[in-house]
Amino acid sequence: MAKEDAIEVDGVVQEALPNAMFRVELQNGHEVLAHISGKMRKFYIRILPGDRVKVELSPYDLKRGRITYRMK
């Protein structure tokens, strides 16, 4: 997935799942399964349920995404 093709949306983490996966509810009400991006994993950025995050979605699979930013 090229970065230009990604769709960026905001959401709220609903649930933490095994293997650094999270269930995220987007602003439009949809729920997606998202994993942490490599840079966030490298710098040990913690994500907890209730955190507001920025998620990148692939145009090919809108049910899976990558968490790229945790908002303060």
Swiss-Prot record:
Pfam families hit by this protein? eIF-1a (PF01176)
- Where's the S1-like domain? 1-72
Which PROSITE patterns would you find in this protein's record? S1_IF1_TYPE
Q: What Gene3D superfamilies does the record point to?
A: Nucleic acid-binding proteins
Instruction: Give UniProt keywords alphabetically.
Output: Cytoplasm, Initiation factor, Protein biosynthesis, RNA-binding, rRNA-binding
Localisation per UniProt entry: Cytoplasm
Q: Which cysteines are joined by disulfide bonds?
A: none
The record's listing under InterPro entries reads: NA-bd_OB-fold, RNA-binding_domain_S1_IF1, S1_domain, TIF_IF1
**CDD domains from the xrefs?**
S1_IF1
Instruction: Give the coiled coil ranges.
Output: none
Q: Which GO terms describe its cellular component?
A: cytosol
**GO MF assignments:** ribosome binding; rRNA binding; translation initiation factor activity
Main function: One of the essential components for the initiation of protein synthesis. Stabilizes the binding of IF-2 and IF-3 on the 30S subunit to which N-formylmethionyl-tRNA(fMet) subsequently binds. Helps modulate mRNA selection, yielding the 30S pre-initiation complex (PIC). Upon addition of the 50S ribosomal subunit IF-1, IF-2 and IF-3 are released leaving the mature 70S translation initiation complex.
Q: Which NCBIfam families match?
A: infA
- Outline the subunit composition: Component of the 30S ribosomal translation pre-initiation complex which assembles on the 30S ribosome in the order IF-2 and IF-3, IF-1 and N-formylmethionyl-tRNA(fMet); mRNA recruitment can occur at any time during PIC assembly.
- Family that this chain belongs to: Belongs to the IF-1 family.
Name recorded for this polypeptide: Translation initiation factor IF-1 1
Organism, per UniProt? Nitratidesulfovibrio vulgaris (strain ATCC 29579 / DSM 644 / CCUG 34227 / NCIMB 8303 / VKM B-1760 / Hildenborough)
